[in-house]
Curated annotation (Swiss-Prot):
One of its GO terms (cellular component) is cytoplasm. Binds 1 Fe cation per subunit. This is Glucose-6-phosphate isomerase. GO terms for molecular function: glucose-6-phosphate isomerase activity; iron ion binding. It is an enzyme of class 5 (isomerase). The keyword Hydrolase does not apply. It comes from the Archaea. Transmembrane segments: none annotated. The keyword Iron applies. It is found in: Cytoplasm. It comes from Pyrococcus abyssi (strain GE5 / Orsay). One of its GO terms (biological process) is glycolytic process. InterPro entries: G6P_isomerase_archaea/bacteria, G6P_isomerase_prok, GPI/OXD, RmlC-like_jellyroll, RmlC_Cupin_sf.
């Protein structure tokens, strides 16, 4: 009849949600995502660091329900490129999402299917609205874990394949101590 309400404790300092589904992405899980393939290969062989962890509370995939998750995106770079999440469109493209920065420093890279991109810097307290039809990826531009909360429709789904194949039209790098958003020479329109 009625679904039971749910309350869970989210540790804003660590990003951990006890009892949540946990996903761990290592650098080796992100082959082909970073521009500097040689640096990627060397770092994978040397230590294969964890790039990010996700703690998700998921509902049935049906219209009207909401999922939420925290992500802990660790600091690091491959060449000049900051660590980032794989990024995705929603499988149901007309679904939106909200992100809330809890700790650390980073940003959200967003892109339309045509490659029009936006960069939104994030720090604790920043709320980002991801409109329908936009791909999105978070980037850690700081020197500590970047932790954020995401809230999204339970039936949105994740289309990682399009990003794995085409990439983003922009990448986020460090150049002369500054965060720069530059064209991705490997982007496939």
């Amino acid at each position: 009849m009625y679904k039971e309400p749910l309350g869970v404790k989210v540790d804003f300092n660590t990003g951990v949600i006890p009892g949540a589904k946990k996903i761990v992405r290592r650098l080796s899980d992100m082959k082909g995502y970073f521009l500097d393939e040689k640096s990627w290969e060397e770092l994978v062989k040397k230590e294969d660091p964890i790039v990010y962890e996700v703690y998700a509370i998921e509902q049935e995939e049906k219209e009207g329900d909401l999922n939420f998750a925290t992500t802990i995106l660790y600091p690091g770079k491959v060449g000049k490129e900051f660590f980032f999440t794989k990024g995705h469109y929603h499988s149901k493209k007309d679904r939106a999402e909200v992100y809330v920065a809890l700790k650390g420093k980073g940003g959200m890279l967003l892109q339309t299917p045509e490659g029009e991109a936006r960069w939104i810097p994030m720090e604790p307290g920043t709320v980002v609205y991801v409109p329908p039809y936009w791909a999105h990826r978070t980037v850690n531009t700081g020197d500590e874990p970047f932790i954020f909360l995401a809230i999204y429709p339970a039936d949105a789904g994740h289309d990682y394949g399009t990003i794995a194949e085409r990439g983003f039209s922009k990448i986020v790098i460090e150049e002369n101590g500054e965060v720069k958003v530059v064209d991705n020479p490997r982007w496939k329109s």
